[in-house]
Amino acid sequence: MMDGGKGFEDALTGEQKIRNFNINFGPQHPAAHGVLRMVLELDGEIVERCDPHIGLLHRGTEKLMESRTYLQNLPYFDRLDYVAPMNQEHAWCLAIEKLTGVEVPRRASLIRVLYSEIGRILNHLLNVTTQAMDVGALTPPLWGFEEREKLMVFYERACGARLHAAYFRPGGVHQDLPDALLDDIEAWSHTFPNVLDDIDGLLTENRIFKQRNCDIGVVSEEEILQYGFSGVMVRGSGLAWDLRRAQPYECYDEFEFQVPVGKNGDCYDRYLCRMEEMRQSISIIRQAIAKLRDCPGDVLARGKLTPPKRGDMKTSMESLIHHFKLYTEGFHVPAGEVYAAVEAPKGEFGVYLVADGTNKPYRSKIRAPGYLHLQAMDHVARGHQLADVAAIIGTMDIVFGEIDR
C-alpha cells in the first residue's frame, strides 16, 4: 500500500518509511549566483545529498581559443570571471610572456598590480554584500554597489570599458594612465575604508549574521588538499597560502601586505578574510600609486608582440609592415608548454598553455578556482539545513562564467 502523503507503509508491521524528497535549487534562484541548478535531496530540513548541475553557460571557450590568434583570445578571459575581469587577462599575458621571454616594463607591471587589486576589491565587495543579502541583510549590497560603481568608472577611464576591459596585453598594458586618474584613485582609497567600517559595523557582530555563518560549511586542511581549493577557501581554514606571497609574480615581492587567515574554516571566517583582504588591497593600491609617480616610461615592451609607436609608423616602412602583420596574422609564440597562475580574487586562476610555434595556441587549459570549490559542494553541505546551502554557496564565491567556460 502506498500513500504519497505518508510515504511507504509495510503491510505486515504497519511501519512507515518516509522517503527523502528532491527539490531543485535554481537555475533561476536569486541565491544561486548565476545559472546553477542544484538537485537537493532532503530529509525534512536536512540536506542528505547535493548534486550541482553545471554547463548551462558553457560556450566552449577552450576550443574556440584554438582557432583564434593569441591577441584575439585575450577578450575571452574577460568573460570568464566577469566580476573582476582584469585578473584573468593577467594570467593569459603571463603565460605568453613566459614562453616568449618578454620583459614587461616596470610602469606596466605596477599598473597591472594596481588594477589587479582594484579587481580584488570589486569582487570581494560584490561577494560580501550579496552573501549578506542571501542570509537576510538587505542594506550592505546598496552600500557596496555604490563603491563598485566608482571602481567601474576607474576601469572605464583606463580602457574605455566598464566590464570587458581587454586592457592587459602581452608585453604590458594597452595605454598609460593619466595623472588625474591616479589622483582620483588615491583620493578614493582614503574614503573607502570608512565604507568598509560601516559594512563591518552592520555585519561582523550582528547576531543573526553570526548565527547564519558560524560553524557552517567548515572545511578542514585535509579536505582543502583533497579537493584542490585555493584562495579564501584555503586561508579561511588557517593556511596562509597566497600566490602573491608564495610564488610572487609581476612585482608583488616589492609590496608590503599581510595575508589574512581564519581559524575555524567556516563561512564566517571566510567573510572576515575577505573584509581584511580589501583593507590589504587598499594598502597595495596606495603603494602602487606612490611607485607609479616615481616611475615614468613606456607601458609596452616594444618588440614583436606589441605594435610600434604611431610616430614610427609615419616614417618607417618596417614599422608599418610590422603593424600590418601583427594585426592580420598575429605574433608567433615559440613552441613549448607553460603554466602561469595568478592569485585571482576567487583563488588560483591558472592557464596551462601549449604552443606549437604558430600564431594560435595549440591547446590551452583554464584552471578556474570556482570549479573546484563547487565540486566539493556535496561534501561541504551534507548534514546542514536547507537554509545553510545559500550561505555556503555565497562564501564559496561562485561565478558561472569561469565554471562553465
Curated annotation (Swiss-Prot):
The keyword Translocase applies. GO terms for molecular function: NAD binding; NADH:ubiquinone reductase (non-electrogenic) activity; quinone binding. GO terms for cellular component: plasma membrane. It comes from Ruegeria pomeroyi (strain ATCC 700808 / DSM 15171 / DSS-3). Keywords: Cell inner membrane, Cell membrane, Membrane, NAD, Quinone, Translocase, Transport, Ubiquinone. It is found in: Cell inner membrane. SUPFAM superfamilies: HydB/Nqo4-like. This is NADH-quinone oxidoreductase subunit D. InterPro entries: NADH_Q_OxRdtase_suD, NADH_UbQ_OxRdtase_49kDa_CS, NDH1_su_D/H, NiFe-Hase_large. Pfam families: Complex1_49kDa (PF00346). It catalyses: a quinone + NADH + 5 H(+)(in) = a quinol + NAD(+) + 4 H(+)(out). Its EC number is 7.1.1.-. NDH-1 shuttles electrons from NADH, via FMN and iron-sulfur (Fe-S) centers, to quinones in the respiratory chain. The immediate electron acceptor for the enzyme in this species is believed to be ubiquinone. Couples the redox reaction to proton translocation (for every two electrons transferred, four hydrogen ions are translocated across the cytoplasmic membrane), and thus conserves the redox energy in a proton gradient. Belongs to the complex I 49 kDa subunit family. It is a peripheral membrane protein. NDH-1 is composed of 14 different subunits. Subunits NuoB, C, D, E, F, and G constitute the peripheral sector of the complex.
